[in-house]
Swiss-Prot record:
Protein name: Ribosomal lysine N-methyltransferase set11
Gene that this sequence comes from: set11
Stated family: Belongs to the class V-like SAM-binding methyltransferase superfamily. RKM2 family.
Gene3D superfamilies: set domain protein methyltransferase, domain 1 (3.90.1410.10)
Residues noted as binding S-adenosyl-L-methionine in the record, renumbered to the chain: Y223
Location within or outside the cell: Cytoplasm; Nucleus, Nucleolus
Coiled coil: none
Lineage of origin: Eukaryota, Fungi, Dikarya, Ascomycota, Taphrinomycotina
Molecular-function annotations in GO: histone H3K36 methyltransferase activity; histone H3K4 methyltransferase activity; protein-lysine N-methyltransferase activity; transcription coactivator activity
GO terms for cellular component: cytosol; nucleolus; nucleus
Role summary: S-adenosyl-L-methionine-dependent protein-lysine N-methyltransferase that trimethylates 60S ribosomal protein L12 (rpl1201 and rpl1202) at 'Lys-4' and may dimethylate L12 also at 'Lys-40' and 'Lys-41'. Overexpression causes a severe growth defect. Has a role in meiosis.
Enzyme Commission (EC) number: 2.1.1.-
Length: 381
């Protein structure tokens, strides 16, 4: 049975269990791009497109017969459940696992440290992937305490959950138990300009149109205001025109012990970013802290430069007196990042085999180039 046939069988099954699927939805498969949902007729604004009842959802509450489930996190339990269903046909939902991706070679979590792309990824992306790898390894060890499962199969199940889970109020006091998998819901792909809204209540999961959808349009959901770094590390894809680009500047900004102590004391240590909307407030505070000289005077709230930073932090000043110095400093930082990004983009192109993970890696560096160039021509505040 083809993947499209598996999806069609899954859609028929959820409808037989009480789900509402609008007749104008067409569940399709795009070659080399995966599944999607298309409109086979015009759809009006504020139309219910999908409504899933709780009896077809997959979470700790609906899969309660396993005695060890409460000894695992929902993520660990669902990862095992999905991977186990492949071998033993537990039928958590007929056709559900059959319609899942057969593999995740496109997902960067599967990259190894000797992969030629690994060392050319942006540092913050590589660190995020290492963190995800460590979480997956920890989850595998926890699951092995109760059941036997081989690592490749568990990794497949873990990535299925990682790329498909959503938050659904199960009624549990433990919010971690709200992690849920929803058959056919996952076929709505992500776009920051989605034509739909998700309505998530304890009774149902509902998707409604927020504008008119024309026949032939792909129907999207918005997973959140995520930049490509997040989309790549979590879901394994990037958008070529993502309005939510954010670049990390931490490794380009150095602080001495006085500056670090001041920023830690006031809750502004680390996580310095810029986006197409400008520099984050944290970043502007961090740079203003760097401008205080000598830095030992950061301990003296009456010192003029320190007082100005504190007034800026507390909203008593717009920081205009130091704005030009802040912009000059940030432009130097962005120039350094721009040079690195241009060099690394060319390195990725030079070793690319044309596969999707290389396309995404190049896009990550393109994001940085575009953001740096834009900000260097505009105000940061």
């Amino acid at each position: 049975m083809s993947n499209k046939q598996n999806i069609e069988s899954e859609v028929s099954w959820v409808k037989s269990k009480g789900a509402f699927v609008h007749p104008s939805l067409e569940f399709s498969v795009i070659p080399d791009a995966g599944s999607c949902v298309l409109a086979n007729n015009d759809i009006n604004e504020n139309t219910v497109l999908l409504k899933l009842p709780p009896n077809i959802l997959i979470n700790k509450r609906t899969c309660s017969r396993y005695s060890f489930r409460d000894k695992l996190t929902s993520f660990q339990f669902l990862s095992w459940l999905i991977s186990e269903d492949v071998h033993s046909n537990l039928e958590i939902s007929p056709y559900y696992t059959k319609a899942l991706p057969q593999g995740f070679s496109f997902h960067p979590v599967t990259l190894t440290s000797d992969h030629p792309l690994w060392s050319i990824l942006p540092d913050e992306v590589r660190n995020s992937l290492l963190e995800r790898k460590n979480v997956m390894a920890f989850d595998y060890e926890q699951v092995k305490k109760f059941v036997s499962v081989d690592q490749p199969t568990f990794q497949w199940g873990w990535l299925c959950v990682n790329t498909r889970c959503l938050y659904y109020d199960t009624g549990s006091k433990n919010t971690e138990d709200h992690l849920t998998l929803a058959p056919i819901f996952e076929y709505f792909n992500h776009s920051p300009e989605a034509q739909t809204a998700l309505i998530n209540t304890r009774g149902t999961i509902t998707i409604k149109s927020t504008r008119r959808i024309d026949k032939g349009e792909q129907i999207f959901l918005c997973y959140g205001p995520h930049g490509n770094d997040k989309l790549f590390t979590e879901y394994g894809f990037c958008l070529s025109n993502n309005p939510n680009i954010s670049i990390q500047l931490d490794r380009f900004i150095e602080f001495d012990k006085w500056q670090q102590s001041f920023l830690q004391d006031h809750g502004y240590w680390n996580d310095y970013t810029c986006s197409l909307h400008g520099a984050s407030f944290r970043t502007l505070v961090g740079v203003r802290t760097l401008l205080v000289s000598p830095s030992e005077k950061l301990n003296d709230a009456s010192y003029d430069q320190t007082r100005r930073v504190l007034q800026y932090i507390n909203g008593f000043s717009d920081g205009s007196r130091d704005r030009q110095d802040v912009e000059d400093y940030l432009k130097k930082v962005l120039q350094e990042l721009l040079c690195e990004a241009e060099e690394c983009k060319e390195k990725v192109k030079g070793i690319s085999d044309g596969s999707y993970v290389f396309i995404c890696a190049e896009q990550l560096w393109k994001d940085r180039i575009m953001c740096c160039q834009y900000l260097m021509e505009h105000s940061f505040e």
